[in-house]
Amino acid sequence: MAPKTTLIAEPELVSKSVNTIRFLAIDAVEKAKSGHPGMPMGCAPMGHVLYDEFMRFNPKNPYWFNRDRFVLSAGHGCMLQYALLHLSGYDSVKEEDLKSLRQWGSRTPAHPENFETPGVEVTTGPLGQGIASAVGLAVAEKHLAARYNKPGFEIVDHYTYVILGDGCQMEGVSNEACSLAAHWGLGKLIALYDDNHITIDGDTDVAFTEDVDKRFDALGWHVIWVKNGNDGCDEIRAAIEEAKSVKDRPTMIKVTTTIGYGAPSKANTYGVHGNALGPKEAEATRKNLGWPYEPFHVPDDVKKHWSRHIAEGAALESAWNAKFAEFQKKFPEEAADLKSIITGELPTNWESIFPTYTPENPGLPTRTLSHQILNGLGDVLPGLLGGSADLTLSNMAFLKNSGDFQKKSPGERNVKFGAREHAMGSICNGLALHSPGLLPYCATYFVFTDYMRAAMRISALSKARVLYIMTHDSIGLGEDGPTHQPVEHLASFRAMPNILTLRPADGNETAGAYRAAVQNGERPSILVLARQKLPQLPGTSIEGVSKGGYVISDNSRGGNSKPDVILIGTGSELEIAARAGDELRKEGKKVRVVSLVCWELFAEQSEKYRETVLPSGVTARVSVEAGSTFGWERFIGPKGKAVGIDRFGASAPAERLFKEFGITVEAVVAAAKEIC
């Protein structure tokens, strides 16, 4: 792609532009009476050089596919990004938006949120998440470029820029992700490290004395040090130009800055990190930096200089659209695939890949069924890619017809994350938020979601369609014992907003779970899968899963009859509920068996539908699930019984564990007899 037409302002105008950014941050935080002014004040030169001189974007179409991506990993410094979006001409950040920083219903929340503010690529705030998500954005660019670019057609060609701080560097997720970034040779990932040596607890000397340069050199990054980040725009510019010349590895530019630069008494102190300057210090800063303007004022010459980005951005997108039109004519199949990734449009008849299972089919673990369906989807969804945290064969989460995404084979679709669960989740967030039609999946044992929960929460908050394939879902994994046996995990994820927790029982339900995950484009999904072999049950269906809960058998239907008891199960325990129902029916009981495969989807159904599944007139209800009983009272009511596990597991064969913990047909039958 041709370089951006760069108009470097005269030094005096550059200085005025940088101070405009600083004072927009100061003024917004003052008005909000809370916030983080120090980081934007110190990083304003970085922001100016990046947005004004290097980044390619169209302010009037924040979602133009081939734009450069920017991630503010130090998300508390959000006013840096909001000021840059405002100056660049984004409609999402007008003056009134700056004035409503951190207020109810504003487009300028306390930390950048991709779903609130067009121009923000990923949600940041928890330190380290931003740089890790940025690795995902850079993976997306490298992968799509390898698959779709042709000689003369560099359709996918953009950079990912990040600003991160000392806190991000301390978080383990950043090191996990940066290790992978170097391993994969992400040459279009450029990170600028705000080296200001201040944390909330004081100087970084209290807890952070490592040599960051040497660490990143050891990881395999190209490292540059800009010693004067306070007003050294020329040095920052030269560093970014050098970084762009390095094609085979990511670059970390350490930029030494002064937090709160320009504030006479608060600069270089932790007091300017997370507090407004206060009226006196704000006024003193105006005098110190020679800023005579009223709050929120953008000088005319600064406004005029930045206004060119609107026309330049439109021209960049127009040129790309023309090139893509040529690409479509010459490479129609590749263009169609790429267009589906850009738009998120699902191909016609994509659901035809889902098999239908009957009780005559052999029983299989749901992780094996997942593998079959995942590969079927891989054949029809060009944006599907992902992998496992060093458990590929155990999770069975790989595409048979693809090789491994590596530095020298970036067009392949199997991603080996190594034992880095946290970074895996964050990288998948970046992949999902790069393009609507990218569908990243990642896999590990369900219990190890403890290592990646922060990333999964960001998935849910960001409306990122990430597919979490979580196997070994209960004591059913057997001898590995309580460290590997999830107990509380289902309950914890069911409590998390905007994420689907799907625990299928057999082939039909596994297919239904994948269908729901693909169709829900604005939330992640967790497929909770069993290691042990499970039968194909009568009465299960793909369509039933879409409703979250449904009846798989009932011998009371007809006339005004109603069941004596309702048995509710999920996953591997749905078979136990079904068999318990058969036993009770032999004794003359009218029994309904319900699969509650996804609580979230069931809660979204109409009250009328939910009543057809769990009629309020039937209070005798028993749930069975090999996990915590927490939350089941919502469905079984005050008169119901919950069969589950409210302690940690143990090391023994699975069959013995189910017996010892009372997750059996006999236990369900006994519980039912107590209440009906």
UniProtKB/Swiss-Prot annotation:
The keyword NADP does not apply. It comes from Craterostigma plantagineum. Mg(2+) binds at residues 166, 196, 198. The active site is at residue 421. NCBIfam families: tktlase_bact (TIGR00232). Signal peptide: none annotated. Homodimer. SMART domains: Transket_pyr (SM00861). Its EC number is 2.2.1.1. This is Transketolase 7. Induction: By rehydration. SUPFAM superfamilies: Thiamin diphosphate-binding fold (THDP-binding), TK C-terminal domain-like. Thiamine diphosphate binds at residues 76, 125-127, 167, 196, 273, 421, 448. Keywords: Calcium, Magnesium, Metal-binding, Thiamine pyrophosphate, Transferase. One of its GO terms (cellular component) is cytosol. InterPro entries: THDP-binding, Transketo_C/PFOR_II, Transketolase-like_C_2, Transketolase-like_Pyr-bd, Transketolase_bac-like, Transketolase_BS, Transketolase_CS, Transketolase_fam. Substrate binds at residues 36, 273, 367, 394, 472, 480, 531. PROSITE patterns: TRANSKETOLASE_1, TRANSKETOLASE_2. The keyword Metal-binding applies. GO terms for biological process: pentose-phosphate shunt. Leaves and roots. One of its GO terms (molecular function) is metal ion binding. Belongs to the transketolase family. It catalyses: D-sedoheptulose 7-phosphate + D-glyceraldehyde 3-phosphate = aldehydo-D-ribose 5-phosphate + D-xylulose 5-phosphate. The record marks 36, 273 as: Important for catalytic activity. Its cofactor is Mg(2+); Ca(2+); Mn(2+); Co(2+).
